[in-house]
Amino acid sequence: MKKASRSVGSVPKVPGVNKTQTTEKTKPESGSSLSAVTKLSKPGTSASLLKTKSNDDLLAGMASGGGVTMTNGVKAKKSTCASTVSSTTGTTMSTLENKPRTVAGSTARRSTSSGTKESSSSRERIRDRSRLSQSKKLPLAGQGSNDTVLAKRSRSRTNPESDIRMSKSKSDNQISDKAALEAKVNDLLTLAKTKDVEILHLRNELRDMRAQLGLNEDQVEGDEKSEEKEAIVVHQPTDVESTLLQLQEQNTAIREELNQLKNENRMLKDRLNALGFSLEQRLDNSEKLFGYQSLSPEITAGNHSDGGGTLTSSVEGSAPGSMEDLLSQDEHTLMDNQHSNSMDNLDSECSEVYQPLTSSDDALDAPSSSESEGVPSIERSRKGSSGNASEVSVACLTERIHQMEENQHSTAEELQATLQELADLQQITQELNSENERLGEEKVILMESLCQQSDKLEHFSRQIEYFRSLLDEHHISYVIDEDMKSGRYMELEQRYMDLAENARFEREQLLGVQQHLSNTLKMAEQDNKEAQEMIGALKERNHHMERIIESEQKSKTAIASTLEEYKATVASDQIEMNRLKAQLEHEKQKVAELYSIHNSGDKSDIQDLLESVRLDKEKAETLASSLQEELAHTRNDANRLQDAIAKVEDEYRVFQEEAKKQIEDLNVTLEKLRAELDEKETERSDMKETIFELEDEVEQHRAVKLHDNLIISDLENTVKKLQDQKHDMEREIKNLHRRLREESAEWRQFQADLQTAVVIANDIKSEAQEEIGDLKRRLHEAQEKNEKLTKELEEIKSRKQEEERGRVYNYMNAVERDLAALRQGMGLSRRSSTSSEPTPTVKTLIKSFDSASQVPSPAAATIPRTPLSPSPMKTPPAAAVSPMQRHSISGPISASKPLATLTDKRPSYAEIPVQEHLLRTSSTSRPASLPRVPAMESAKSISVSRRSSEEIKRDISAPDGASPASLMAMGTTSPQLSLSSSPTASVTPTTRSRIREERKDPLSALAREYGGSKRNALLKWCQKKTEGYQNIDITNFSSSWNDGLAFCAVLHTYLPAHIPYQELNSQDKRRNFTLAFQAAESVGIKSTLDINEMVRTERPDWQNVMLYVTAIYKYFET
């Protein structure tokens, strides 16, 4: 009997073993004694164990809904608890031994812990036989509970700190979860208090009944144990029902949280995949993070029951370097810390509530502090190390997240810029294609007209041959125009061949383009058909998925109905237990009556009655044991069904998520296909519109062709008229030849006179230049002498002002006389130079020659620049010069003006070469101002002028029989030559189009230089410009420009006087932006950015920043 009652009563004490596993792992030597003490503790401790059972079951249900890693930890805990219970209960709880132990035996750590637990359970069986040893070991239970309370309190102190640090990233979710957990804890505390009140009430009633019966103390203790076990058995079904309801509610809530976390996980995965980041690059960081979180194996082993081992199990079971591990690690560290905090708070509060309800014997039998002194210190040190590790991991995670955000923003900016450039390029290609088609149509029309013209030409050639034959028959002499036959005719024929070849080549190209377009149209139609087929298949698959979901829902309802049936059976078993309890009470009353009869009356009848009662009692006990076994079976079945329901729900949820994901993917593909179909339809409509436009153009070209035919007929009539005029002109040409011979003699005489005039002019020019050089040299010497004399005068004045006034006055008079003599000499030389000029006839000849060979332009009549005046191209622009530099530059310029005016106030003939007089053309072929030759190079210009005059003499004297029209044609052909030799004439059409494109879009040349897109090319240019500048790292056009230093650095390379870059810092943003924008506005770059907005935002609009930087590049580089 006692054995059976022991087996029945040992079932609900499983949570006690589960509760004390943390202390068993920290102190394995005292683990067996603690488990033995918790088995045979007082009713108060049993009640507290019952409450901890309900709490642990509740937390295990919460952890089972928290994800795969939490369920692994809970299954391992259940398997270890089942092994310890099966070793203590024996054959009655053999069903618990049949639970799967694969999770517990997967790792060596769990196998060793199960072995120690089996050895401790064997020790417990040996210690069960002696009460004395059990009563001695009783104080260890109080110490174990105190140790667990201390460990949990220290855990609850460290974990909220880590929670506070982790809650900075996910504050909203954690606040809601914390509020829900606090509400659950409050409910559990109220439930525990009500049950404690009921237990105290029942204990008082039991003691009153025992006092009324007057039983012995041994029997009281045995009855206490039996009644305690029965009370636990009675209260268990109600606890099972309440915990089932609570677990269901919590399971649904935690499933919702799990779905939210999975959605967030999926979103983060998609973002990482979109950004192109792989976890292999961050494998070292992830391994360090895992190492930090599993620094000491004792901490993970001690926190295994609280969910601390989930991270290590997930790390051991997952492949290193996968994307899912990184995201699940971050989320599970947050969730595990949160759950462990809630569990520790709940355990600590429950232990504080249950401490006043324990008996005074436990408080008196508490062990000394030397036995349990090391455990809290070890726990605190380990918690401190884990807190530091969590801080390091949080810092690593925040830094990694910041880097990922920066990379994401720069890649998003680059993608947007690339998309804009692609849209621009697509528009340009469309325009070019339309222009190409228009040119092709025009070339087709030109080819048709060319073919018609060639036919007409053949017809006219046949007519000409016919007319020639007629002329030969009638013996009429005719003159063939050599010019018509040779140059112009060959050129037209060559152009005709080139046009025909180009037309044939472009016709082949257009045919290829047409074939390509037809192929693309066919492919688009085929893709459309495939898309429609895929849409139908996806719809069918969607219907199939819906049918599968309906079947799963039906199976779920069936499982729920079976669960309700099992609940009904449990309720019936509970009613039966209540009936048996009442019967047992009735039997106890009978036993009490029998004892009273035994004390008063006959003993033989009482012996018979006792035997009968003993038999009835044995039958009742066997019946109770069988009912207990049936109840255990039903509980196992209920647990098995609940696990099956959880698995089915997990599978259903996974299946539903996969179905939703597939449906979303199918919807995305459907939208893509619809968009492609719309694009194809728009292209088709555009092609139809282009066809209609081409037909209209064909009609217009036909009308133009008719008009051209009319014009050709008119031109034929004019050709006939021109032929008549040609004969008249030939007669006039003969007369002109005769006149030309007469005038050629006069022209030769004029050339001889002109040669003499040129020689005289060159001599005059050389003499004048020599005299000007002598005058300049003498003036320079006089100025030097004057400077020396003034210096000597100042020195003499400083030394002897009062003594040497008269001497200085005489000396100055002498100097003035010398200067007057010099001035008189200069005047004589000028008069002599003017008197040595040629006669007015020579001047008139030179002027008439200049007027005949040049068309004067107002731009060329400007005052020439003196040799000492600075070149206009050498002066720096106003943009790159500060105001002080402008003053310093304008000083020597103004000082050099009087010197220039002294030397020469009019242009001299020596500074203009003779070939420029002879070959000077109109203003279109010459720049506005001609460069003048300095006086230092007068000898070179004289030699060049003489050489050129000799060449002109040879050229003029060579063609004796030439007509004056050839010389007159020199002025007309020279502009063509100058145009062909000009730099703009040598530019090909492709370079002209490129220059036009660069003027329109300045970034195109930059993109060709650096390669890639325009945005990346401009970014590389900015990086190249800001090399060597501190505190600047340009990686994008948003966050790299938010402090203004990048603008200041770029503008400092061009305008160093406007921006004091060494005095700037990144903190004073407004000053940086103000300096940069003012410097840009000073050279004419308008500010398109708002200073207040740039100062306020950390990430300004990258498009506005890029436009402003483009304006800077366009101003300074193009």
UniProtKB/Swiss-Prot annotation:
Residues 79-119, 359-373, 937-946, 972-991 have a biased composition (Low complexity). Residues 120-131, 158-171, 947-957 have a biased composition (Basic and acidic residues). Residues 29-52 have a biased composition (Polar residues). It is found in: Cytoplasm, Cytoskeleton; Cytoplasm, Cytoskeleton, Spindle; Cell junction, Gap junction. Residues 193-281, 396-450, 488-808 form a coiled coil. InterPro entries: CH_dom (IPR001715), CH_dom_sf (IPR036872), F-actin_Monoox_Mical (IPR050540). GO terms for cellular component: cytoplasm; filamentous actin; gap junction; microtubule organizing center; spindle. The keyword Cytoplasm applies. Residues 1-176, 299-324, 359-391, 856-879, 921-1002 are annotated as: Disordered. Pfam families: CH. Residues 1012-1117 form the Calponin-homology (CH) domain. Keywords: Cell cycle, Cell division, Cell junction, Coiled coil, Cytoplasm, Cytoskeleton, Gap junction. GO terms for biological process: actin cytoskeleton organization; cell division. Involved in cytokinesis and spindle organization. May play a role in actin cytoskeleton organization and microtubule stabilization and hence required for proper cell adhesion and migration. Belongs to the cytospin-A family. May interact with both microtubules and actin cytoskeleton. PANTHER family: CALPONIN HOMOLOGY DOMAIN-CONTAINING PROTEIN DDB_G0272472-RELATED, CYTOSPIN-A. This is Cytospin-A. It comes from Gallus gallus (Chicken).
